[in-house]
Amino acid sequence: MGRLGYWTLLVLPALLVWHGPAQNAAAEKGTPALNIAVLLGHSHDVTERELRNLWGPEQATGLPLDVNVVALLMNRTDPKSLITHVCDLMSGARIHGLVFGDDTDQEAVAQMLDFISSQTFIPILGIHGGASMIMADKDPTSTFFQFGASIQQQATVMLKIMQDYDWHVFSLVTTIFPGYRDFISFIKTTVDNSFVGWDMQNVITLDTSFEDAKTQVQLKKIHSSVILLYCSKDEAVLILSEARSLGLTGYDFFWIVPSLVSGNTELIPKEFPSGLISVSYDDWDYSLEARVRDGLGILTTAASSMLEKFSYIPEAKASCYGQTEKPETPLHTLHQFMVNVTWDGKDLSFTEEGYQVHPRLVVIVLNKDREWEKVGKWENQTLSLRHAVWPRYKSFSDCEPDDNHLSIVTLEEAPFVIVEDIDPLTETCVRNTVPCRKFVKINNSTNEGMNVKKCCKGFCIDILKKLSRTVKFTYDLYLVTNGKHGKKVNNVWNGMIGEVVYQRAVMAVGSLTINEERSEVVDFSVPFVETGISVMVSRSNGTVSPSAFLEPFSASVWVMMFVMLLIVSAIAVFVFEYFSPVGYNRNLAKGKAPHGPSFTIGKAIWLLWGLVFNNSVPVQNPKGTTSKIMVSVWAFFAVIFLASYTANLAAFMIQEEFVDQVTGLSDKKFQRPHDYSPPFRFGTVPNGSTERNIRNNYPYMHQYMTKFNQRGVEDALVSLKTGKLDAFIYDAAVLNYKAGRDEGCKLVTIGSGYIFATTGYGIALQKGSPWKRQIDLALLQFVGDGEMEELETLWLTGICHNEKNEVMSSQLDIDNMAGVFYMLAAAMALSLITFIWEHLFYWKLRFCFTGVCSDRPGLLFSISRGIYSCIHGVHIEEKKKSPDFNLTGSQSNMLKLLRSAKNISNMSNMNSSRMDSPKRAADFIQRGSLIVDMVSDKGNLIYSDNRSFQGKDSIFGENMNELQTFVANRHKDSLSNYVFQGQHPLTLNESNPNTVEVAVSTESKGNSRPRQLWKKSMESLRQDSLNQNPVSQRDEKTAENRTHSLKSPRYLPEEVAHSDISETSSRATCHREPDNNKNHKTKDNFKRSMASKYPKDCSEVERTYVKTKASSPRDKIYTIDGEKEPSFHLDPPQFIENIVLPENVDFPDTYQDHNENFRKGDSTLPMNRNPLHNEDGLPNNDQYKLYAKHFTLKDKGSPHSEGSDRYRQNSTHCRSCLSNLPTYSGHFTMRSPFKCDACLRMGNLYDIDEDQMLQETGNPATREEAYQQDWSQNNALQFQKNKLKINRQHSYDNILDKPREIDLSRPSRSISLKDRERLLEGNLYGSLFSVPSSKLLGNKSSLFPQGLEDSKRSKSLLPDHTSDNPFLHTYGDDQRLVIGRCPSDPYKHSLPSQAVNDSYLRSSLRSTASYCSRDSRGHSDVYISEHVMPYAANKNNMYSTPRVLNSCSNRRVYKKMPSIESDV
């Protein structure tokens, strides 16, 4: 007691002096004061002043109370002295908390502090030494907290160490030290509930109070190399001493103890073996000053929380004496707020047992220098260890090392070594893998890091496992830290070679290449894999060439196809067809309809083109047998050609992958990379054998590639795929594996894995290692047994190697089809250029090409004429320019001829001389209007004076509003308003042979059609003469109307049902419905007054005259449905024929109809042969058979056998007027190259105006005389040597009426268009009109009061302006539509009537056309039927033939003439 009192007397004055002023200051401020005492042992190198200064104003900022720190240093820390010091301190300073630390390792200190806290309820923090030792059981009312870990926390770290190093087999040794049961229970519970394959072999509990013999007996039961020990430090000395005597502390044994055993790290008993592992509180990184500061912070934070919640803090204890045995527990204590505390950003919370929730534990090992070394750290429930492989320590000098346990280093490189993470569930390595440790850097600047447990597998790992079983050794495997194979840098080896050289590893296993430099420092086993240097490149998506669609065939094949085969075959087909007797160009077959379409070279090419590409295009098939055989062979060729093209097309339309072709390391791309643009980029992984080989053999190459070197293989593969690298040079075995396992198989090795500088992989061992021989023998055994081959198949073969020959199909993109689109775009551009050139040529240049500019024959005409001359051997004479024709173009010359016809006088001046007068029409325009009466079998010219007459109704009557109105329907000339009713019957006046007489009749024939000029044979224009008796009696017609034809009067008649349209025509062909037409009658819906049936501007005389013609027995009335919708449908023509023919009429065979049941009532008029010259001009060959072309709806059934007579000739004819010319023996199917003198003198530049070459008539004889002369000379039924005029071919002859009811046995021209069976829907020419027949006016003749206007003739079907469209008609034109003639009538003349009113008036005209006069009041349309008989002209005579575009009549212009060149 005296000693304690002396200590108290020395200490208390100082405490009072320090505490008094602070407490007074706190009282003055009114803030509560918190007194905390710090007691430490004198062994710590710290003073009391330093302890008080640990809490300064910085730490007290923001606290609601004043903190007073009382620091004391104790010399003795035995239990008695400890209790005395604490009680004296409480009595003198009235403290609220205590921070205690000592320098002992006695757990009794912690027990004493726990007792004091349970008695005084003052919170005590044990921060160091014995005060922080583990306590088994604390008092329930204890307020003692320790900076340490509980038994369970330390046991968890111990098991984690064994798990990381795969020490799954262990034994547990304990004493009866307090807490041992908790330790054993926790270990067993953890092992039983863990997925780790723990194997706890023994649990030994020792009682050290007995003799050592018993302890040895228990320790002998241990058979595991890992032992967990739980005891006090003094007991551990005894147990480890006995274990050493039993040999349990050598290389193969690992003792792991808690902090209770290690105690104070500065005190190390000599019995502790080297390599002893302990889990301890962190004294290395957690200093005593930091612990004191954290203790003060914990108490201050708890007091502040209590003050904030309860507004007070517990009253400080004044003394620990006089306490009851069981003190009363206060309602609120400070330690309740110490459980969850966060201070200075650290979680310093405590558990209910008084231990830290997150203690700072470390793993320490007693190294060979007998010092505790920190090798691991437990932080945030994570253990990090320094050593990849736990070092084997030689515990004592008498211990022998274990040479069978090897430390092996490896390198991650697939497929030889593949590193994976551990199983997250079991935290171990799965089957077929071995544990390996990998160093992971935490701080790159300081190279600080930790070794993490990984799992390794691969080709080399499987070899290692086989070697371990065969050679009998154990190993610890770890990955090299720098990830290199090994290179000597600054005379220091790195990588795996460095680990072996510096004996950190016994063996190096992996993709380690054997070379001379490495063999100098290490020993290599025999190679187990053959390898070398290879080059890897990446496949890049190639581009499809725009000409890929042409690549299935070579250029020569395409040339042969389109140039040689197509042209030659097309010419052959054309030639065979041209000279075939049954072809299109030879209409010689019996019963063959003449004037059919021609089979041209263009049609032949189009046919063959359609066959090659199997296009459904309209083509015209040949009819000749030879040409059909040729086409059949071509069709067979086309099948093979197209099939071959289709089969090969897919292979060329896919995107071909591009691969850089490299032949080897000496390739130009490696040696001279700058020669390429961009430069060739290649690299390798440095510090390897590949780099060394390149450096030694190719210095320039090595210097260039250093900037493209990669850190590893994976980085190189990424660079290849992203285009940063063009080639990667590396070990062949690795590259082959990567190429085989690459996703998408985009990486390939050159030459299918071609190897340069062949070498192998081997195992590196320390120089002079005893393991080399055993390992070499084992490897050779693996090779001999085939085990090595199995491993190579398992690991080194990739899936891409097995799929090399598989075809990978993909969707065709726009790149694949770009060439086709380019071709279409080029075609569009070429079409646009052609379109512009076509318009430029037509409007600007064609006149010069046709010779108009130079008045010389044009180029095209000259070529055509030259070809003809060469083929037929005909000499072509140059034509002299006619002085009478000085206009530009043949059409202008034709107009000039038409204008010269405007010299017709009125009735008073109507004589032969006046008719031939050259006066202009202006001289007669004031003398009255002209009405041409449509009188059957008579031509009466009836004239009346001009008078005003206002029509009561329009020609359309009540249905006028149903008609369509068009903007431009006529020609731009003023002639468009005049009626040209077609070709009229012509005879030659016997008194004046140079005079042509025209017969004007009202009967119009409906069954005619236009035809082409050059397609018609010359012989088809000849007709036989016939004899007939004059008949004057005819039956009267019924009141039914008949529909008239739409054909233009410009053409010769032809069969309606047999169109002249070629089967390859691209124009739409209009038909009428052939079905059920025989008895079809069109409904008359006009229902209008009589006045509405006639033109609005007809005079009374004209109207009266026309009305009187209705009762004529020879009239045929055309009707049309007036209430029909304006859809331009053509109704079938209806003929009302009530004509009674005289029985004595003789019909010659020459003009027999094709249908015996139709038109038998119409007699034909034989022409006088006397006016005809060149009587020997007509052919008499049997091959030419002529037919009358006047049959209509009902006359298509006549047999072809009833033909006309045959004629033959050996001379030729004039190409213009058809006059006979001698010395020609050619075919009449060919166009004659000669002309008569008249045509040569009067013709224009081109011989395409032959239809104007009519003789200028002289003074005619009277009508009766001419008629009698003609009639008397034609009774012999022989019309000989009659020549017909030639009409020009025009391009609007493709519109057909609805097919008449025909005899199906007589085939019509086939048409391949889809609209063959279609009605003429929507046609512009579907609206026709009904015209009543007028009664004859007797033989009263009235003359024309005015001349004919020349503008009646059109110079072209193509309008000069877009507004002058002849295909459109206006309402005004519809008002002026009249009935037109039937173009088939020129082939037939009706017998003249014997009645008074049945005489013809023959007028000498310049034109054979009939004209309807126009006065200044408007139009006076008259219904005209004209009959033009083909004739033959004398030599040196010129006849002007009509070329009529009658825009006033119901005839419409159907098609445009393409160009003048079509006639050439």
Swiss-Prot record:
Residues 599-620 are annotated as: Pore-forming. Residues 1-22 form the signal peptide. Residues 23-556, 647-814 are extracellular. Detected in striatum. Detected in forbrain. Detected in cerebellum (at protein level). Detected in brain cortex, piriform cortex, hippocampus, caudate-putamen, dentate gyrus and granule cell layer. It comes from the Eukaryota. Disruption phenotype: Mutant mice appear grossly normal and are fertile. NMDA channel currents are decreased in mutant brain slices. Contrary to wild-type, where tetanic stimulation leads to a strong long-term increase in synaptic strength, only modest long-term synaptic potentiation is seen in mutant mice. Mossy fiber granule cells from mutant mice present a decrease of the slow component of the excitatory postsynaptic current. The slow component of the excitatory postsynaptic current is nearly abolished in mossy fiber cells from mice lacking both Grin2a and Grin2c. Its main location: other. It is found in: Cell projection, Dendritic spine; Cell membrane; Synapse; Postsynaptic cell membrane. Residues 1033-1043, 1052-1061, 1070-1083 have a biased composition (Basic and acidic residues). Zn(2+) binds at H44, H128, E266, D282. Residues 1021-1083 are annotated as: Disordered. GO terms for molecular function: calcium channel activity; glutamate-gated calcium ion channel activity; monoatomic cation channel activity; NMDA glutamate receptor activity; zinc ion binding. Heterotetramer. Forms heterotetrameric channels composed of two GluN1/zeta subunits (GRIN1), and two identical GluN2/epsilon subunits (GRIN2A, GRIN2B, GRIN2C or GRIN2D) or GluN3 subunits (GRIN3A or GRIN3B) (in vitro). Can also form heterotetrameric channels that contain at least two GluN1 subunits and at least two different GluN2 subunits (or a combination of one GluN2 and one GluN3 subunits) (in vitro). In vivo, the subunit composition may depend on the expression levels of the different subunits. Found in a complex with GRIN1, GRIN3A and PPP2CB. Found in a complex with GRIN1 and GRIN3B. Contains an N-terminal domain, a ligand-binding domain and a transmembrane domain. Agonist binding to the extracellular ligand-binding domains triggers channel gating. A hydrophobic region that gives rise to the prediction of a transmembrane span does not cross the membrane, but is part of a discontinuously helical region that dips into the membrane and is probably part of the pore and of the selectivity filter. Belongs to the glutamate-gated ion channel (TC 1.A.10.1) family. NR2A/GRIN2A subfamily. This is Glutamate receptor ionotropic, NMDA 2A. It comes from Mus musculus (Mouse).
